[in-house]
Amino acid sequence: MKKIAVNIVRGILVALSKLPLKFHYFMGDIFAWMARVVFRYRYDVVMINLSRSFPDMKYKALQAVAKDFYRHLGEIAAEAIWFSGSDYKRLYDSGIVTVTNPEDFNELFLSTPSMTVLSTHCGNWELLGGFLGYRTSTGVKVALEEDQIRVVYKQLTNPVADEVFKRNRASALEIVGTSCEIESMNILRHAVANRDKRKVYIFPTDQHPYTKAAKHPIGEFMHQQTNVMLGSVGLACRLSHSVMYLKMKRVERGRYEMTLIPMCVNASEMKQEDLMRKYYDLLQEEINETPANWLWTHKRWK
């Protein structure tokens, strides 16, 4: 039954993905308005997060950021549906994402055993599976093959939704016959077993610690005392990975710039806490640059 349900939902998404992106944005705007105005979806959470993160910002300015955030949330949904049936050529032709510094990535990746990339919920994280299909600002290709990418995710409670989201995020890779998603509980075993193979492990790292995960205080982030998980940097330190921060800036509707910022060459030479502190400093800088670009509905500070 699960397989049938997954195939039905995936079939609908792939069919919808063939429609123009402009149509999806139109529907996304309706979704955003309903989420913000009609259903007030986590509106209190958004406003509390914003007011505590920007204590000097006036209430009207906070409301404006919230409005822009919900519009962005609608765009994320629209782009995720459009992405679900897109191959590399379609992603490239659309220009939806541009990698700004492929040379920096290539130099670090090719000179180290493997790499850990610490991603965020800025921009549109649902588009990460198309990394190899995106344009670069210099024309230099990213020195990476399909089977070298691993994106870490937390398994959803609903098995159908979990499988749909997993396949949707890796649609472009699925089209060429591979996949990239690995559940967080299995990543250490996989990385150790494949330590002799150069790979990139992409970790979304800015969530509140999972229920069963150890909580580590990191100090202030966005003016609030923050607990973090150290699993991503722990893996990097244990296996001597290089580490990069993935910045995803929303330039305008339908245009993102992806920049990979080097954090260290050999994580085993750094403390896990220092790496994580550096990550949150970079994230705070990114959020301050474009406040509406982050996922404010997330209960980051519980």
Predicted segments, located by residue:
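Membrane-anchoring hydrophobic helices of lipid-metabolizing enzymes
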Residues: 1-119, 124, 167-168
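A broad structural signal for alpha-helix termini and local helix breaks/kinks
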Residues: 19, 38-39, 53-55, 173, ...
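Short, contiguous strand/loop micro-motifs
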Residues: 33-34, 92, 152-153, 218-221, ...
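Residues that cap or flank secondary-structure elements
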Residues: 38, 96-97, 157, 224, ...
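Catalytic core of membrane glycerolipid acyltransferases/transacylases, capturing the structured
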Residues: 111-182, 210-220
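Non-catalytic C-terminal accessory region of glycerolipid acyltransferases
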Residues: 134, 167, 171, 182-302
